[in-house]
């Protein structure tokens, strides 16, 4: 317990954060404008009422200065002088300012933590998304069970504000934040439906992402804290997580919750083979141990969300499956562990033995159905995978149309070149190729057969299948047919194609 007390005192020794005055500085909103130059609400493309200018910011800051009280009732929100004649624009500008200001203390802590852990020096070597898969090939083959847990969502914003106060010490800032959220929508029902989440995320994308990521980071912090403090295996990579105050009270409460079910409260945390991954609203747990220990981890997450975030996960939807029989989705792939059995004949003197050997191999599969749904959503095909034309691109030149399709095909080919079976990838290429031909035929107001016969574009469109093999043959001096069957991970992919994600 002495170690926890020292940890708590060090967290309490942080200085006061003075974020409130920054909300009244014009350059903060200028930073928000520069950060969101390509998609910001500040751009003059929505109409006169939504045009951004420093004059609008100055008037908004003046109204914020003149506000006498910060906590008001919902009935008076429509009469409050805090908002101008354009409430939506004011709320968007203020939310951008809130997002910029509230990120400042976290960026400061993150930079200091990364410098202490010396992660920045080696970060350049691990930027690629594909660098994850060689790691999984080494680790997942030794694991036996996996569990997909949907992160409970949405959550009431009052809980997020209370948790945020543990990290940032600035009472006026949080009063103004509550005022902004109260004026924007009904506080009691805010973020309790998917419709309200969609509306808020579209109007205030930066603030929404911060609040959502903060919620996820908070429960992961508690998870990692208990994982490292109660285990003899202290992992240095976990040092990037921040310190927080009032954690002993939460830890004691968690101990009381588990004391009813477990005789040794924290012994189940000592699982050196547990692996945790968060991806697209899910947290994936994989372990080598028996399902009983995985079940304890599942109940830990359920109690954590219920006790500290007042959200109710669905325990019946959390299944623990053998990794050899269950596939889970990660970074646009379907992953599972396949057991390859081989029989070896061994002979000693006059005796002959047949030995059966099982070798685990990570199977990385291209998710063909989600990709077809993504192609249908992007209007390259229908829901059954039948290619259709793209009339929106018909105004471009033939070269630009072919180049667009080739770039999409090339990106998908690079991203999925590490898959175990490439037949699904060839089908996606085929859909894009026919969609390109139909788009060109639609532009020239002709049929596909007549267009190919007249223009001779069939040879040009062969690049969909020949370009990748030609590039690989230049890089690797080996047989091209062998290269096409092998997995190739590219270490220069920093983000995935939009078609990869179907959610």
UniProtKB/Swiss-Prot annotation:
InterPro entries per the UniProt record, alphabetical: Domain_X (IPR024937), Maturase_MatK (IPR002866), Maturase_MatK_N (IPR024942)
Pfam families in UniProt: Intron_maturas2, MatK_N
Main location: plastid
Disulfide bridge positions per record: none
Gene source species: Lathyrus vestitus
Name of this protein: Maturase K
Localization: Plastid, Chloroplast
One GO cellular component term noted in the UniProt record for this chain: chloroplast
Organismal lineage: Eukaryota, Viridiplantae, Streptophyta, Embryophyta, Tracheophyta
Keyword Cytoplasm assigned: no
GO MF annotation, one: RNA binding
GO aspect biological process, one term: tRNA processing
Family assignment from sequence similarity: Belongs to the intron maturase 2 family. MatK subfamily.
Keywords: Chloroplast, mRNA processing, Plastid, RNA-binding, tRNA processing
Function noted in UniProt: Usually encoded in the trnK tRNA gene intron. Probably assists in splicing its own and other chloroplast group II introns.
């Amino acid at each position: 317990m002495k170690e926890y007390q020292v940890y708590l005192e060090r967290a309490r020794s942080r200085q006061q954060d003075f974020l409130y005055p920054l909300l009244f500085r014009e350059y903060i909103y200028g930073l928000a404008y520069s950060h969101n130059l390509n998609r910001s609400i500040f751009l003059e493309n929505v109409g006169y009422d939504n045009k951004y200018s420093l004059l609008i910011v100055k008037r908004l800051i003046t109204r914020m200065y003149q506000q006498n009280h910060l906590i008001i009732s919902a009935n008076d929100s429509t009469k409050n002088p805090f908002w101008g004649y354009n409430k939506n624009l004011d709320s968007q500008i203020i939310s951008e300012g809130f997002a910029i200001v509230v990120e400042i203390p976290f960026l400061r802590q993150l930079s200091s933590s990364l410098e202490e852990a010396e992660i920045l020096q080696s970060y350049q070597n691990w930027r690629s998304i594909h660098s994850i898969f060689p790691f999984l090939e080494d680790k997942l083959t030794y694991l036996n069970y996996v569990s997909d847990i949907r992160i409970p969502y949405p959550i009431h914003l009052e809980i997020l504000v209370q948790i945020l106060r543990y990290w940032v010490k600035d009472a006026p800032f949080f009063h103004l934040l509550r005022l902004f959220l109260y004026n924007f929508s009904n506080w009691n029902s805010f973020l309790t439906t998917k419709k309200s989440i969609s509306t808020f995320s579209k109007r205030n994308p930066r603030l929404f992402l911060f609040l959502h990521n903060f919620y996820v980071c908070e429960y992961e912090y508690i998870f990692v804290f208990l994982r490292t403090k109660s285990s003899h295996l202290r992992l240095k990579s976990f040092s990037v997580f921040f310190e927080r105050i009032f954690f002993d009270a939460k830890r004691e409460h968690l101990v009381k919750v588990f004391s009813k079910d477990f005789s040794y409260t924290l012994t189940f945390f000592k699982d050196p083979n547990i692996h945790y991954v968060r991806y697209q609203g899910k947290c994936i747990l994989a372990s080598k141990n028996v399902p009983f220990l995985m079940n304890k981890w599942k109940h830990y997450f359920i109690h954590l969300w219920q006790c500290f975030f007042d959200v109710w996960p669905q325990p019946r939807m959390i299944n623990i499956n053998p990794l050899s029989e269950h596939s889970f989705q990660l970074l646009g792939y379907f992953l599972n562990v396949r057991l390859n059995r081989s029989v070896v004949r061994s002979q000693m003197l006059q005796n002959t033995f047949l030995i059966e050997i099982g070798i685990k191999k990570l199977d990385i599969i291209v998710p063909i159905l989600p990709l077809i749904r993504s192609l249908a959503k992007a209007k390259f095909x229908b829901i059954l995978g039948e290619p259709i034309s793209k009339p929106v691109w018909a105004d471009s030149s033939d070269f630009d149309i072919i180049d667009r399709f080739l770039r999409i095909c090339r990106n998908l080919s690079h991203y999925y070149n590490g898959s175990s079976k490439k037949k699904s990838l060839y089908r996606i290429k085929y859909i894009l190729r026919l969609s390109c031909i139909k788009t060109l035929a639609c532009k020239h107001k002709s049929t596909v057969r007549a267009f190919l016969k007249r223009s001779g574009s069939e040879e040009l469109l062969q690049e969909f299948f020949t370009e990748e093999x030609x590039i690989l043959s230049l890089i690797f001096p080996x047989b091209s047919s062998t290269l096409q069957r092998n997995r190739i991970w590219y270490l220069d992919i920093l983000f995935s194609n939009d078609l990869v994600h179907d959610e």
